[in-house]
């Protein structure tokens, strides 16, 4: 999914009126937001953070200094590890690392949903939708987290709902 489409989903989930003008710049198609009253903003994380502040939902950026740093860390992870990596090996490594991290966590940063969860959900959707049942079981913690995030009101929107089986079908899947 193109960054502009993700940013429009984020706008809607934040309750912002549509109408921002997005474009893409350079070979890597880095998103750019044309602002009315200032310079253009560039980069998925920068624009998403701006939208959260515009919607007065700063709690999505973390409530403590540590949570804010963790949200930024996961936004960086999203841009550096998820975007532009489409090989099967890259995807498997990414999901394995994320699965280990989520072993004892409900959210990526802290005890509530944050912008990091939302943007990582949008970024991973294209990979998760193609996983087999066995692969979803292999990455059980990612599957649990993803299923939880997709059921938040206004997050999934028009993206396809991904079905996760509650009872394990395969033994020793990880």
Curated annotation (Swiss-Prot):
A GO BP entry: translation
Chain segments carrying region Linker: 57-63
Pfam family, one: Arc1p_N_like
Annotated region (N-terminal), positions in chain: 2-56
Modified residues (N-acetylalanine): 2
Alphabetical list of PROSITE patterns matching this protein: GST_CTER
Key words, A-Z: Acetylation, Coiled coil, Cytoplasm, Nucleus, Protein biosynthesis
Residues with PTM N6-acetyllysine: 138
Covalent S-S links between cysteines: none
Residue runs in coiled coils: 153-169
Taxonomic superkingdom: Eukaryota
Start and end residues of each GST C-terminal domain: 50-173
PANTHER family named in the record: EUKARYOTIC TRANSLATION ELONGATION FACTOR 1 EPSILON-1
Assembly mode: Part of a multisubunit complex that groups tRNA ligases for Arg (RARS1), Asp (DARS1), Gln (QARS1), Ile (IARS1), Leu (LARS1), Lys (KARS1), Met (MARS1) the bifunctional ligase for Glu and Pro (EPRS1) and the auxiliary subunits AIMP1/p43, AIMP2/p38 and EEF1E1/p18. Can interact simultaneously with MARS1 and EPRS1. Forms a linear complex that contains MARS1, EEF1E1, EPRS1 and AIMP2 that is at the core of the multisubunit complex. Interacts with ATM and ATR.
Name assigned to this protein: Eukaryotic translation elongation factor 1 epsilon-1
Organism, scientific name: Mus musculus
